[in-house]
């Protein structure tokens, strides 16, 4: 121990070891405590099938046929022709998932941004941006093809997505992936992480 110019005792300890009653003149103990005890998560949320009801919207234009069935019957090109043929309106008019607002209310106060894949047409980029502006103004939207989502993965970065392949790639890059099946299940998994 020695005395500094303020005549207060300074105790030297190993980094990361501190006691509640230690003097913390420079805020180092507080900073260490935040780093060690409170992981800071960044949430990246998918839109289609998580927040927005892509399947329901698609069925409106496909005479009630589910997207997977339509693609299987007519092929991927015809599938995207149907979606992109509706232009910006397809995306702007997308309804919320039945539990989408509950899910959003739970995550919106964390460091959260949207990470969504556009379709083959640029109209989806505009439509998704307009949907976000109309439904959750000010929220950051990143548009990236599905195979590029993994580039945003990092320790303590959480991807919430309804596609298992996106989750698997995210985890392979060191991120935390939550396969979204419902708001209730995703919220439960977030609670396990302390959120």
Where are these predicted regions, by residue range?
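Charge-dense, intrinsically disordered terminal/linker segments
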Residues: 1-43, 50, 68-69, 96-101, ...
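Flexible, charged surface loops at secondary-structure boundaries
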Residues: 39, 108, 151-155
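Active-site neighborhood of HAD-like aspartate-dependent phosphohydrolases
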Residues: 39-84, 172, 182
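A structural signal for well-ordered alpha-helical scaffolds and beta->alpha junctions
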Residues: 51, 55, 97-100, 124-129, ...
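Short, acidic loop-to-helix structural element flanking the phosphoryl-transfer center
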Residues: 84-114, 121-126
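Substrate-recognition "cap/lid" segment bordering the active-site pocket of phosphatases
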Residues: 115-158, 164-168
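Acidic, Mg2+-coordinating phosphoryl-transfer loop and its flanking beta/alpha structural elements
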Residues: 158-190
């Amino acid at each position: 121990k020695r005395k500094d110019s303020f005549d207060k005792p300074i105790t030297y300890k190993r980094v990361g070891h501190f006691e509640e009653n230690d003097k913390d003149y420079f805020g180092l103990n507080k900073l260490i405590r935040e780093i060690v005890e409170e992981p800071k998560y960044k949430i990246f949320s998918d839109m289609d099938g998580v927040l927005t009801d892509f399947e329901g919207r698609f069925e409106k234009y496909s005479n009630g046929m589910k997207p997977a069935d339509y693609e299987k019957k007519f092929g991927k090109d015809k599938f995207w022709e149907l979606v992109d043929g509706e232009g910006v309106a397809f995306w702007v008019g997308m309804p919320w998932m039945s539990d989408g607002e509950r899910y959003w209310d739970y995550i919106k106060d964390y460091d959260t941004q949207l990470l969504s894949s556009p379709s083959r047409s640029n109209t989806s980029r505009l439509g998704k941006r307009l949907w976000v502006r109309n439904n959750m103004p000010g929220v950051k939207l990143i548009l990236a093809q599905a195979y590029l989502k993994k580039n945003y993965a990092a320790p303590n970065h959480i991807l919430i997505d309804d596609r298992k392949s996106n989750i698997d790639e995210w985890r392979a890059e060191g991120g935390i992936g939550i396969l979204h099946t419902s708001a209730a299940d995703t919220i439960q998994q977030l609670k396990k992480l302390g959120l």
